[in-house]
């Protein structure tokens, strides 16, 4: 819960995505035969939609992405990938709150907790390793 309050405070105070100062840029994630591409146009019903800070045509800084299945990530980005503090929420209400680290070109859980739909901690990661699975 402490991490959630800190993250919300940081985003509300400093984020052009959520703050009133500037909305940021909009990008859409396109899946192609040669990989994923970020483009400035798309359809939110068929492509994930990103709103936030952008550098070199990719999410970089603070931003929000909403996937077509209803999942949502709010937090830090680097070169189009989750990096730093963030929250990934699934449509069923389960979520990961913590930090992400890019390893081998892939964003991975780093330090954080995974919560069930009732807000109860189910898993904990430290330095990229799952260290605890909580019993219910």
Predicted segments, located by residue:
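Glycine/tyrosine- and acidic-biased, solvent-exposed loop/turn segments at the edges of beta-strands
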Residues: 14-136
